[in-house]
Amino acid sequence: MDKHQKFDQSLFQRVDINVLKRSDQLIGKPTTNFVEIMKRLFQNKWAILFFLLIVLIILLAIIVPLASPYSAVTPVSNNALAQNLPPRYLWNGAGDIQVEKITARSIAEVAQSSGVLVGKLPEASSNPLATNVKYNIAPYQLAELKNYYPLLGTNGLGVDIWTLLWASMAKSLWIAIVVALVSMVFGTIYGAIAGSFVGRAADNIMSRIIEIIDLVPSILWIIVLGATFRFGGVKQFDDSVVIFTLIFVFWTWPAATTRIYILKNKDTEYIQAARTLGAKQIRIIFVHMLPVVTGRLAVVFVSLIPAVIGYEASLVFLGLKPATEVGLGALLNQVTSSGNIALITSSIVSFAILTVSTRVFANALNDAIDPRVIRR
């Protein structure tokens, strides 16, 4: 090019280098992988919605049983007329709500003597104590119920449904979280050890143990182990037996997940560098390998919660756990034999919301972590 040739300045534009938004000029602490995952997760509107639902359920399960003036096991009144009460709100007077009942005449006479009978008591038959009669009552005119405002009414035992619902949710969530935490800790350590010794006898034996446990149906393991480790000769499982059997069933899930992702990352450059520098195997496992699979394990943990609750509830239907205890299983068992609409609706809807919320949030968390999804 001729040194005397001049450039056409109109083809160029002056810029200030200080205002260029170049990443190589930015000074500051780089964002961590955790922060990036959280950003991607909460860009998903559905993830935010279902996460808030999970938080709301947990808060209600903690607060309602503590704040409620009513018990989750004791009836609000010993009067038989307090059973299967309809919901009542502040704008309803004591006589505004009427209930049609079909019971023995003896109970109808109690309603009449209590002053809550609406209309005339039906005529007696030849055997009045054994004959069912239809009549209407205004139950909230009872002295002990005049100041009672149940959001969902009472069940067939006279227990406040709102309190029972959230006490049952709290009990089932507590069992699920304990089982999930213990399963995660034991399964993660087990899977990390197996994955780091791949190709050796230790990995072969440990992998076969996982396969044997997974080969047998989970409910069969629960029945056999529960029958073996029952305490005091009782016919049904208590909470400690339920927790033990569920941990035995579910620990293989995080163990298998950890082993798979350890195998995928065991030959990466930073692991090889750690070995070259003389790092011990236990340090490589717990300092260098496990942090890589933390995100995947978070997905497994969230997914374990509804799975554990589902199995715990199924034990009541199988007759292996008392139906009189507080818990979602016992609550859903009441639904099968009850015509109480409030009890049926609240039980099914709350269980469905919890199950769907945890599964959708687990899927959203998996999408935020999975690099194959991120690159799409």
Swiss-Prot record:
GO cellular component, one term: plasma membrane
Keywords recorded for this protein, A-Z: Cell membrane, Membrane, Peptide transport, Protein transport, Transmembrane, Transmembrane helix, Transport
Ranges for domain ABC transmembrane type-1: 169-362
A GO BP entry: peptide transport
Transmembrane segments annotated in the record for this chain: 46-66, 149-169, 173-193, 209-229, 242-262, 297-317, 341-361
Signal peptide annotation: none
Compartment list: Cell membrane
InterPro entries for this protein: BP-dependent_transpt_permease (IPR050366), MetI-like (IPR000515), MetI-like_sf (IPR035906), OppC_N (IPR025966)
CDD domains registered for this protein in UniProt: TM_PBP2 (cd06261)
Topology of this chain in the membrane: Multi-pass membrane protein
Subcellular location, principal: membrane
Origin superkingdom: Bacteria
Protein family according to the UniProt entry: Belongs to the binding-protein-dependent transport system permease family. OppBC subfamily.
Subunit structure: The complex is composed of two ATP-binding proteins (OppD and OppF), two transmembrane proteins (OppB and OppC) and a solute-binding protein (OppA).
Function statement: Part of the ABC transporter complex OppABCDF involved in the uptake of oligopeptides. Probably responsible for the translocation of the substrate across the membrane.
Protein name listed in UniProt: Oligopeptide transport system permease protein OppC
Organism per entry: Mycoplasma pneumoniae (strain ATCC 29342 / M129 / Subtype 1) (Mycoplasmoides pneumoniae)
Gene: oppC
